[in-house]
Amino acid sequence: MKRLIHTAVLAAALAFALLLCGCSGAETSHKAPQRAAVESGERQFAQPSDGDFIAIFSTSLGEVRAVLYPDAAPMAVQNFVGLARSGYYDNTVIWRAQYGFAVQGGDAGGTGSGGATIWSNNPYPLEADSSLRHYAGALCAAFAQGGEVMGGNSQFYFVTALPNSVDETMQQQLRDNGYSDEQVSAYAAAGGLPYLDNTDTVFGQVYAGMDVVDQIACVPTVKNE
């Protein structure tokens, strides 16, 4: 079973449809989590300032807004915005919607195995910045496809990890690996996917409409055979 969610997105009026293809073998449904506001000094939890680059995703379930970070991930932002302005994302699909993990799209082929870049489709390198983490709501460039680590391209995802996903054991592991107390506290409050921090690139963060992202992740889906 597949459900189309028609969407208009971003900074130059990018429009595309989200076709949700689940990751489980049977149809499943979930209830969107309740997310409290996170009080943190981490930049990803600050409201955008004048002059910040904002991505606006207008979907049939509501609007999502994300601030982009060209200072920390210049190539990821340049590629995303360039492709959006060119119309590349028009009528592409969200091929992965996994509750408590992520919703992912950006492959014009709709399979998750392809992608494009503004550099004649040549991939760009990983941009891992210690000031940006895979907190819930992070907008990320996907580098791992089919179990292989690839260069960056058009594929992106929103982290939908649950608020309680980073438990005390994982918090201690983060401290042991040099994460600051502020970052550990942010992960504990927001939830996230810290094991992806040096694997994929974070280039934005949802600051409005995370409830919409969660609704997309909760749409009943079945495995796309």
Model-derived regions: residue spans:
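Sec-dependent N-terminal signal peptides of Gram-positive bacterial secreted proteins and lipoproteins
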Residues: 3-25
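Cyclophilin-like peptidyl-prolyl cis-trans isomerases
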Residues: 14, 22-225
